Amino acid sequence: ERFAADYERESGQISVPEIKEKNGIKIAVIGSGPAGLSFAGDMAKYGYDVTVFEALHEIGGVLKYGIPEFRLPNKVVDVEIDNLAKMGVNFIKDCIIGKTISVEQLEEEGFKGVFVASGAGLPNFMNIPGENSINILSSNEYLTRVNLMDAASEDSDTPVPFGKNVAVIGGGNTAMDSVRTARRLGAERAMIIYRRSEEEMPARIEEVKHAKEEGVEFLTLHNPIEYIADELGKVKQVILQKIELGEPDASGRRSPVAIP
């Protein structure tokens, strides 16, 4: 499937699916991530007049801001977006539904349906001492600034810190994307800190494998309990607590238990 898709894209002869006759019904899609784009494509095939509203300045949602170029090149995403445009899907960027325009205004403009695909963009923090220190970022902010705002450039208006020692808390795919990005930005020592064992990591096996091949260190069965900042307020140290695994929790994985 990957070979066929790449061949079609590189040949420039991309097929557009059959579109039913336009029915004149306007549908609004809030968000241009995977769910929004998939829904837009399906509705367009059935003849609906679809408009996708994106809050950011790039169409693609998490496909653009959350997944690094080395894992999903933007040009691949852009081809899919171009296909949707050829199918008749309209795209409006820099538009926040509820602020730039209201749902009531969409209804006044004739939209008969609204599909909310805004994603789960709010990060979860641990609420531990020192968490507000300078250079502590959520993966969401870090990847967005690097992937979408060119924050790795010295001329960027929103530069990210180029830490020589970088710790990423968590063991999912987003954690792997973050730590591998840090390595590419020059981190001499990049480490995953995870409260369970490697077997319980939710990240895909191949993502863990690639991270190890790139020199990422893994410290499992440890969890941060405090961050220490220097006199300028920049994080310089993290205090960890050792963890052991107890009985399985609701996720089916063994629950982390702090060792006194």
Task: Give a label for each model feature.
Residues 8-27, 144-164:
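A short, basic/flexible loop-to-alpha-helix module at the beginning of a structural domain
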Residues 75-125, 138-141, 146-157, 161-162, ...:
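A Rossmann-like FAD-binding core segment of flavoenzymes
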Residues 35, 58, 121, 174, ...:
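Conserved Rossmann-like nucleotide-cofactor binding loop
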Residues 1-18, 57, 129-140:
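Non-heme iron-sulfur electron-transfer modules
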Residues 1-5, 51, 55-58, 88-91:
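Iron-sulfur cluster-binding cysteine motifs and their immediate structural context
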Residues 25-52, 174-183:
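N-terminal Rossmann-like FAD-binding beta1-loop-alpha1 element of flavoenzymes
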Residues 28-30, 167, 191:
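Conserved beta-strand elements of the Class I
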Residues 48-64, 190-199:
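Glycine-rich FAD pyrophosphate-binding loop
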